[in-house]
């Protein structure tokens, strides 16, 4: 398995994503936003940061980058796509995930560890966790308030697309939502950073199982 780690101007978690992929036992390669092909890749990791300086709004300018059409193609083919923080914002901007990310209710940038609950462990991203398991991931965002209409929220609930919730909501997200998947279950977006939760020495290794779950799910289908 080989992941493409996208790199935009202002990305600052691309190396963490790369490290997470390698740590889970697969290949990874950095891919510049100006590239026009993801041929040969089995999945996409869209890292956090401040793509294009968050001008207009977070993820807006990245959403029209040349590489995005290929991200959509891989998603349509059922390949795993994970967007974290700014990556989540980009996924909502390009329509692969519903809703939007707004300014935190506090209007402050939040940077700390947060306790989260796995509320759906039947996905390619969470199948190594226990249902209801509590995990610790770092958060680092100013626009992490997940918002959606009541209609979209009911669809998310009906389709079990909500996979991760905050235990102590730090940003005002609708129903404490921290992470969701698309209807097909192969595209995932979350504001917390599992790629920064790989070592107990750094405070938490709760994120290891998320990347291992992605690899496990892919291998079950292809090996």
Swiss-Prot record:
Residues 3-223 form the Glutamine amidotransferase type-1 domain. It is found in: Cytoplasm. SUPFAM superfamilies: Class I glutamine amidotransferase-like. One of its GO terms (molecular function) is ATP binding. It catalyses: N(2)-formyl-N(1)-(5-phospho-beta-D-ribosyl)glycinamide + L-glutamine + ATP + H2O = 2-formamido-N(1)-(5-O-phospho-beta-D-ribosyl)acetamidine + L-glutamate + ADP + phosphate + H(+); L-glutamine + H2O = L-glutamate + NH4(+). Pfam families: GATase_5 (PF13507). Keywords: ATP-binding, Cytoplasm, Glutamine amidotransferase, Hydrolase, Ligase, Nucleotide-binding, Purine biosynthesis. One of its GO terms (biological process) is 'de novo' IMP biosynthetic process. Gene3D superfamilies: 3.40.50.880. Its EC number is 6.3.5.3, 3.5.1.2. It comes from the Bacteria. Pathway: Purine metabolism; IMP biosynthesis via de novo pathway; 5-amino-1-(5-phospho-D-ribosyl)imidazole from N(2)-formyl-N(1)-(5-phospho-D-ribosyl)glycinamide: step 1/2. One of its GO terms (cellular component) is cytoplasm. The active site is at residues 85, 193, 195. Part of the phosphoribosylformylglycinamidine synthase complex involved in the purines biosynthetic pathway. Catalyzes the ATP-dependent conversion of formylglycinamide ribonucleotide (FGAR) and glutamine to yield formylglycinamidine ribonucleotide (FGAM) and glutamate. The FGAM synthase complex is composed of three subunits. PurQ produces an ammonia molecule by converting glutamine to glutamate. PurL transfers the ammonia molecule to FGAR to form FGAM in an ATP-dependent manner. Part of the FGAM synthase complex composed of 1 PurL, 1 PurQ and 2 PurS subunits. NCBIfam families: FGAM_synth_I, PRK03619.1. This is Phosphoribosylformylglycinamidine synthase subunit PurQ.
């Amino acid at each position: 398995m080989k992941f493409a780690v996208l790199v935009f101007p202002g990305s600052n978690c691309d190396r963490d994503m790369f490290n997470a992929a390698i740590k889970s036992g697969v290949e990874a390669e950095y891919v510049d936003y100006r590239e026009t092909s993801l041929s040969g890749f089995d999945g996409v990791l869209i890292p956090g940061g401040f793509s294009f300086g968050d001008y207009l709004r977070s993820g807006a300018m990245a959403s029209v980058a040349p590489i995005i059409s290929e991200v959509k193609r891989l998603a349509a083919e059922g390949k795993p796509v994970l967007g974290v923080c700014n990556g989540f914002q980009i996924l909502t901007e390009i329509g692969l995930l519903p809703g939007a990310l707004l300014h935190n209710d506090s209007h402050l940038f939040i940077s700390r560890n947060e306790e989260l609950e796995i509320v759906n462990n039947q996905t390619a991203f969470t199948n190594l966790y226990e249902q209801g398991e509590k995990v610790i991931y770092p958060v680092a965002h100013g626009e992490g308030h997940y918002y959606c209409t009541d209609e979209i929220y009911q669809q998310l609930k009906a389709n079990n697309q909500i996979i991760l919730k905050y235990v102590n909501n730090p940003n005002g997200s609708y129903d404490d939502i921290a992470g969701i998947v698309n209807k097909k279950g192969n595209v995932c977006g979350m504001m917390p950073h599992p790629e920064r939760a790989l070592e107990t020495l750094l405070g938490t290794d709760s994120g290891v199982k998320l990347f291992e779950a992605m690899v496990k799910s892919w291998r079950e289908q292809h090996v």
